[in-house]
């Protein structure tokens, strides 16, 4: 077991639960399913009938893959104690991991520990992690290892820890022409390369993004954001009232780079980081870079507004496009989420 896996699993109440453990899911009269050590979270999801159910996961580390299908609407998945460190759902597939049936590799989205296509999903007070490590698998070149892959409109995460390295959180949409909305509040998200990425309208409020140390000689060592917003969507990724810290040396990371997927070459990535403290781990002189030179970041919708901290210092103005006061009024959680008010029922 590596040091990272020991750190992830140490100090958690309850036992280690295997994905194949026989389910012993209890359903009470309040439409609540309880999952305890020895049970499977996926078994609880499979037992859901109808909308509006709640799954309460009791303290423990549950080593399994969890998939919430689109038909399970308005589901709440929450940790029992309110402390996200007490409940950990973790697995270790990567993009390049071979499937057991020999049908190929998982791919980026398929590597996710937690997948949801359900509209109206709420996840709170737990940890979603992918503890696959590059050092343990030098033969694998597809090193993306996703902790959570989320599609479906009105998905919300509150007080959730999302832990991985490359591609930690994939904020996607249910279709190329869908503008699915996702809301993350008071979440902790760590990783190294493109660890918050995708095409959803995704709002991060009061969140903590943390870049990890990497044992590599090159810089940048990674990027926090990699949006792939559809050209027709006026709203991509918004980070507000958040903070960005780093376990690496100063200026080792970029704030973002645009992702224009081969399956959607018309994408026009959109990112706004505002009212956020950016630590010294982000390169202040050149905070953005390209994924491919054919799609330069300067042609994308990348903006900042009223950020603070050493990583936010504007030394070369053309390298840090800023919103005006009037423009900033168009980039708020309310304007991004429209008629959906996720805080009302959290």
Regions found by a protein language model. Give the residues of each.
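C-terminal segment of N-terminal export signals and the immediately downstream linker at the start
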Residues: 1, 21-33
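Sequence-level preference for short, compositionally simple segments enriched
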Residues: 29-346
């Amino acid at each position: 077991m590596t040091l990272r896996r020991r750190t992830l699993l140490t100090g958690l109440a309850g036992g280690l639960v295997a994905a194949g453990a026989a389910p012993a899911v209890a359903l009470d009269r309040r439409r609540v399913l309880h999952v305890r050590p020895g049970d499977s979270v996926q078994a609880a999801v499979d037992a859901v009938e109808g909308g509006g159910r709640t799954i309460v996961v009791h303290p423990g580390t549950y080593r399994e893959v969890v998939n919430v299908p689109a038909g399970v609407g308005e589901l709440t998945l929450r940790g029992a104690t309110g402390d996200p460190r007490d409940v950990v759902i973790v697995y270790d597939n990567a993009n390049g991991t071979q499937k057991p049936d020999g049908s190929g590799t998982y791919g980026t989205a398929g590597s996710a520990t937690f997948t949801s296509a359900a509209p109206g999903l709420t996840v709170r007070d737990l940890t979603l992690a992918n503890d696959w490590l590059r050092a343990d698998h030098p033969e694998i070149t597809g090193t993306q290892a996703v902790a959570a892959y989320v599609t479906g409109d009105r998905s919300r995460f509150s007080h959730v820890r999302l832990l991985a390295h490359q591609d930690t959180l994939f904020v996607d949409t249910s279709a190329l022409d869908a503008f699915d909305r996702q809301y993350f509040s008071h979440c902790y998200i760590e990783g190294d390369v493109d660890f918050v990425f995708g095409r959803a309208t995704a709002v991060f409020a009061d969140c903590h993004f943390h870049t990890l140390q990497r044992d590599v000689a090159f810089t940048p060592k990674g990027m926090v954001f990699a949006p792939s917003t559809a050209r027709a969507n006026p709203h991509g990724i918004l980070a507000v009232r958040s903070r960005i810290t780093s376990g690496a040396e100063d200026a080792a990371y970029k704030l973002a780079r645009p992702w224009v997927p081969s399956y959607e070459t018309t994408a026009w990535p959109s990112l706004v980081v505002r009212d956020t403290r950016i630590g010294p781990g982000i390169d202040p002189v050149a905070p953005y870079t390209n994924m491919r030179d054919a799609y330069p970041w300067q042609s994308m919708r990348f903006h900042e507004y009223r950020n603070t901290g050493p990583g936010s210092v504007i030394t070369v103005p053309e390298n840090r496009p800023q919103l005006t006061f009037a423009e900033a009024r168009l980039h708020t959680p309310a304007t991004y989420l429209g008629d959906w008010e996720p805080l009302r029922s959290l």
